[in-house]
Amino acid sequence: MNFQGLVLTDNCKNQWVVGPLIGKGGFGSIYTTNDNNYVVKIEPKANGSLFTEQAFYTRVLKPSVIEEWKKSHNIKHVGLITCKAFGLYKSINVEYRFLVINRLGVDLDAVIRANNNRLPKRSVMLIGIEILNTIQFMHEQGYSHGDIKASNIVLDQIDKNKLYLVDYGLVSKFMSNGEHVPFIRNPNKMDNGTLEFTPIDSHKGYVVSRRGDLETLGYCMIRWLGGILPWTKISETKNCALVSATKQKYVNNTATLLMTSLQYAPRELLQYITMVNSLTYFEEPNYDEFRHILMQGVYY
């Protein structure tokens, strides 16, 4: 359905005039609105993923909470957007859910493609640190992102040095009342996320915990450097079991993974991925140590 021209009424009774379609993904379509600072994200209510996003926005992404966390951690920027409003729209046969969220600029995937599918190591390390800061905030609220990738990382409209991790349709609550979720498989959750970057735990049906997001970020950084992961081509065939088995083969062979993907082994990624692979499912990572490792790649 094309929503352009429709007037949507949100939960606060404000009205939004839907403009042209500017993006479409696995978790909804994105349209401009009559306010250039915001976009509206729409999908059928029955799909459920936008409700997951709405819940995450309202429970976790409160500006006051983010600001307080930044001050307490001495971190200048947390790349998470907030939700202006939400609501429901009913057509003749289908009911839709919509969110009104901040409008951003181009995504990192477009930037990488414009640079011949390769970014300088310094840029990759800086992006890695930004995403690490962002997922640390999420993790300390008890949530994992579950779908880190270049197309879900978006530049600010004005300040191109600010990045935002978007699309919260696969967020998972791995902590509740101070208790970590148990290490139990759910066959319905197997292979969630983007196959090329899905963490091994998710392939097996476990809830993505902190180590899963860090694992995915490692795969992404290899790709951003221009590497081709050993399972990249397999991912295109949607052979989930073979992708999972191939990833598992490299868990204790980080140097081989890097040499196969990049034809060289950047010291920072070797240390980063090795440290990620040493984490247990329940373990809280030493984010400062991960930041320190990536920062070495910024200056050397």
From Swiss-Prot:
Enzyme class: transferase
Stated induction or repression of this protein's expression: Expressed early in the viral replication cycle.
Protein kinase domain: residues covered: 16-282
Enzyme Commission identifier(s): 2.7.11.1
Protein name (record): B1 kinase
GO cellular component term of the entry, any: virion component
Catalytic activity field: L-seryl-[protein] + ATP = O-phospho-L-seryl-[protein] + ADP + H(+); L-threonyl-[protein] + ATP = O-phospho-L-threonyl-[protein] + ADP + H(+)
Biological role: Essential serine/threonine-protein kinase that plays different role in the viral life cycle. Phosphorylates the host small ribosomal protein RACK1 thereby customizing the ribosomes to a state optimal for viral mRNAs (which contain poly-A leaders) but not for host mRNAs. Facilitates viral DNA replication by inhibiting host BANF1, a cellular host defense responsive to foreign DNA. Phosphorylates host BANF1 on serine and threonine residues; this leads to BANF1 relocalization to the cytoplasm, loss of dimerization and impaired DNA binding activity.
Subunit structure: Interacts with host JIP1; this interaction increases the amount of MAPK bound to JIP1 and subsequently increases the activity of transcription factors, such as JUN, that respond to these complexes. Interacts with protein OPG198; this interaction inhibits the repressive activity of OPG198 pseudokinase on viral replication factory formation.
Active site positions: 147
High-level lineage: Viruses, Varidnaviria, Bamfordvirae, Nucleocytoviricota, Pokkesviricetes
Superkingdom of the organism of origin: Viruses
Keyword annotations of the record: ATP-binding, Early protein, Host cytoplasm, Host-virus interaction, Kinase, Magnesium, Nucleotide-binding, Phosphoprotein, Serine/threonine-protein kinase, Transferase, Viral release from host cell, Virion
PROSITE patterns from the UniProt entry: PROTEIN_KINASE_DOM, PROTEIN_KINASE_ST
Gene3D superfamilies: Transferase(Phosphotransferase) domain 1
Subcellular location: Virion; Host cytoplasm
